[in-house]
C-alpha cells in the first residue's frame, strides 16, 4: 500500500471504477484508499440488490435485497456503506447496478463454473443439447454485452447528474 501511495502521490483521477468489492468491509477499505485520488468514485454493484421475489421491472428506487442470497445482501450492504462514507466528503460517488454481463471470455450461467468453463454452455447450445433452467424455465434474466455496459458507464464519468446517484445499466436482451 505504501508503494502504491507513493506512486499515486499528488495524482487525482477523473474516476476510479471499483469492480472488486463484495462486502461492506471491502467497500470501506477501497473507498478510504481510492477516494484520496479521484473526483468520482464508481461502485459496480448489481441488479441483484433488488428484491426479485416481487417481480416486475426494477427501477433504481425499487425495494432492495432478496434476503436469502448472500451476494444480494452483501452488494446492498456495500452500497449503504459507500453512501455513509461519502456523505460529508468532496468525493462524488456513482453506484452502477448492471444486469448479467457477458463477453468473449466470460458468459455467466448458474450451472457453469465461474471461470474457465463457460464455453461448455455455448457448446451445448451449438450442439442442440438441453440446458438446465430454473423454475420450469420461467425465470427471466436481463443480459448485455460488456461493450454495451461500457457505453453506459462512459456517459456517467464526470457527469454532474450522476454524482451521488445509483443507475441500472441493462441491455435489451432477456
Question: Language model features by range: what are they?
Answer:
Residues 3-11:
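Short amphipathic alpha-helix with an adjacent loop that forms part of the alpha/beta core around
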Residues 66-97, 104, 117, 126:
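Active-site Tyr-X1-5-Lys
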Residues 3, 15, 29, 81, ...:
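Alpha-helical elements of Rossmann-like donor-binding domains used by nucleotide-donor carbohydrate transfer enzymes
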Residues 107-114:
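Short, flexible/disordered intra-domain loops and linkers
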Amino acid at each position: 500500500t505504501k508503494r502504491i501511495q507513493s506512486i499515486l502521490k499528488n495524482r487525482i483521477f477523473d474516476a476510479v471504477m471499483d469492480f472488486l468489492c463484495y462486502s461492506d468491509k471491502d467497500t470501506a477499505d477501497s473507498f478510504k484508499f481510492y477516494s484520496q485520488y479521484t473526483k468520482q468514485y464508481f461502485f459496480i454493484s448489481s441488479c441483484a440488490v433488488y428484491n426479485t421475489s416481487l417481480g416486475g421491472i426494477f427501477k433504481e428506487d425499487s425495494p432492495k435485497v432478496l434476503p436469502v442470497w448472500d451476494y444480494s445482501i452483501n452488494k446492498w450492504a456495500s452500497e449503504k456503506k459507500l453512501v455513509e462514507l461519502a456523505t460529508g466528503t468532496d468525493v462524488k460517488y456513482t453506484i452502477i447496478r448492471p444486469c448479467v454481463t457477458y463477453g468473449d471470455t466470460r458468459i455467466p450461467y448458474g450451472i457453469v463454473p465461474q471461470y474457465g468453463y463457460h464455453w461448455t454452455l455455448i457448446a451445448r447450445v451449438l450442439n442442440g443439447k438441453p440446458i438446465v433452467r430454473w423454475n420450469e424455465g420461467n425465470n427471466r434474466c436481463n443480459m448485455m454485452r460488456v461493450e454495451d455496459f461500457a457505453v453506459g458507464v462512459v456517459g456517467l464519468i464526470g457527469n454532474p447528474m450522476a454524482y451521488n446517484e445509483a443507475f441500472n445499466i441493462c441491455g435489451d436482451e432477456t
